[in-house]
């Protein structure tokens, strides 16, 4: 008698959408019941890395939001800022025109969610960095962000508090996130930002070599620095650095109306020449005249300690909303 072996068909690997829903469900549960927030942060970091570049970027943003998450949690996410698994060098070779360079380091010294950075030397002897975009990153992020939209809508519908994830805020965040994959826009942002800050003596913005850039690569001046969170020189005045950073943002927002909106520690440095260095110009916000005027008024009210003025300006700008049914402005002012 002939026996025929039968095998169960292999299950297809779970889709990205299924993985995303599974992560969201587990995170909501763990966030409510896991008391050790460092443990939660470590688990979240590993899950985001597995889910891919879109979620790594969301983790980078979360790592800087000490106003929303406990420090034990955000500390675990900090490695996402510049320590993401890189794509293979053979993929890089297919993207980069190596004929431009006399030297090109195959191992990236920095790998982020949307691209990775290699050191190189141009034929004119200039030391540069080459930022290489991950393959198909826009399409990947588009699918992922559509899944995130669907999950947030579901969670809000069933009564789960999603924080600042209203439809408007979510859509705006996704728009900026997808915009970061546009290297031509980032090149223009970097050129304009450098021009805006050229007279600010304590700020350094690397030069872009546009002739060597493409839709998938950005070639910039190499500027060495230390991360602001890893300064080792005991003689460095950290208070002065903080003041310089604040002053640079006053210039960016109120004077130029064009500011760096992704200032996590992986995108900021302090050079040996005592300058604050800005990197990565994928997320830059161009303020309208109305918003610039609003910021100027807001800073004036903060200096004058005018609480009523601060609240009124924030309401006028749409930063906060007030329900007059439950809470009136005089009630807020009296707090």
Ranges and model annotations:
Residues 1-250, 257, 269-289, 293-327, ...:
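Broad phosphate/nucleotide-binding scaffolds in NTP-utilizing and phosphate-metabolizing enzymes
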Residues 262:
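Conserved catalytic-loop position in the HRD/HxD motif
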Residues 265-267:
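Catalytic-loop Lys-Pro-X-Asn motif of eukaryotic-like protein kinases
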């Amino acid at each position: 008698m002939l026996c025929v072996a039968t095998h169960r068909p292999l299950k297809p690997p779970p889709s990205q959408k299924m993985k995303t829903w599974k992560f969201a469900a587990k995170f909501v549960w763990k966030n409510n019941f896991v008391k050790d927030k460092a443990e939660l942060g470590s688990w979240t970091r590993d899950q985001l890395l597995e889910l891919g570049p879109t979620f790594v970027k969301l983790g980078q943003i979360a790592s800087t939001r000490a106003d929303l998450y406990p420090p034990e949690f955000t500390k675990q996410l900090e490695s996402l800022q510049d320590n993401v698994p890189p794509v293979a060098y053979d993929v890089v070779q297919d993207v980069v025109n190596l004929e431009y360079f006399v030297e090109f380091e195959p191992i990236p010294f920095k790998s982020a969610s949307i691209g990775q950075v290699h050191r190189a030397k141009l034929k004119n002897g200039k030391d540069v960095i080459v930022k290489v975009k991950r393959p198909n990153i826009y399409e990947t992020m588009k699918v992922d962000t559509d899944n995130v939209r669907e999950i947030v809508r579901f969670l809000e519908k069933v009564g789960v508090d999603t924080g600042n994830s209203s439809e408007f805020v979510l859509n705006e965040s996704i728009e900026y996130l997808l915009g970061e994959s546009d290297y031509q826009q980032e090149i223009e942002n970097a050129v304009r930002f450098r021009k805006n800050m050229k007279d600010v003596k304590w700020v350094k913005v690397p030069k872009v070599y546009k002739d060597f850039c493409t839709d998938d690569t950005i070639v910039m001046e190499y500027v060495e620095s230390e991360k602001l969170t890893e300064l080792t020189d005991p003689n460095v005045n950290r208070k002065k650095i903080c003041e310089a950073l604040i002053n640079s943002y006053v210039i960016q927002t109120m004077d130029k109306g064009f500011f760096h909106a992704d200032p996590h520690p992986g995108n900021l440095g302090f050079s040996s020449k005592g300058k604050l260095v800005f990197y990565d110009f994928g997320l830059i916000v161009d303020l309208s005249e109305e918003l610039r005027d609003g910021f100027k008024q807001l800073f004036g009210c903060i200096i004058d300690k005018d609480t009523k003025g601060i609240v009124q300006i924030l309401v006028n700008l749409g930063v906060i909303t007030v329900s007059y049914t439950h809470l009136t402005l005089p009630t807020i002012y009296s707090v």
